[in-house]
Regions:
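Cell-envelope/extracellular polymer assembly enzymes that use nucleotide-activated donors
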Residues: 2-4, 31
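Short, well-formed alpha-helical segments that are part of the catalytic scaffolds
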Residues: 11-25
Length: 159
């Protein structure tokens, strides 16, 4: 099974090396591609210097455009699953294999990683937490399903 980690990156020079090391150490069965979204810092130079696998967007498309570029890359290169994985260190690559197993066994089209299941680690701002709780409640009301982190930047999808 071909698996790809899509890392949208805008001005992530301070985080990318750690993120790539996390992926290569904790999810060795996954390939990765960094989508450099026309960063204004040294993100592109860092990718080149370290030999990271990357695509360089000539204009800033925003998070949506960068992620969409990554999904198109995954599709055209025959990946069976792809996961959006923010380049800022909010997520742990140690969870990727478990997510892939859930996706495969459940027959679901998407699995969303949550930053909030474990109480330590990432903490968002108060206003953002209110928004996340609102969306969690709305999704539960409309679907009957509980999604603890609907704004997560770690979403895995199948082909």
């Amino acid at each position: 099974m071909k698996k790809l980690v899509i890392i949208p990156a805008y001005n992530e020079e301070g985080n990318l090396e750690k993120t790539i090391n996390d992926i290569t150490e904790n999810a060795p069965g996954f390939d990765y591609v960094i989508i450099n979204d026309c960063s204004t810092d040294n993100t592109l130079e860092m990718c080149r210097h370290h030999g990271f696998h990357y695509l360089n967007l000539p204009v800033n498309l925003g998070i949506g455009g960068a992620v969409q570029t990554g999904y198109r890359y995954a599709f055209y290169h025959g990946y069976d699953l792809a996961v959006q994985f923010d380049g800022d260190g909010q997520h742990s690559a140690a969870h990727l294999e478990d997510m892939a197993k859930v996706l495969e066994k459940s027959g679901a089209d998407m699995v969303i990683g949550s930053r909030f299941i474990e109480k330590e680690g990432f903490q968002s701002s108060g206003l953002r937490r209110v928004g996340i709780r609102y969306f969690t409640m709305l999704i539960r009301l409309l679907t009957g399903k509980t999604i603890t982190d609907p704004t997560s930047g770690m979403r895995m999808v199948n082909r």
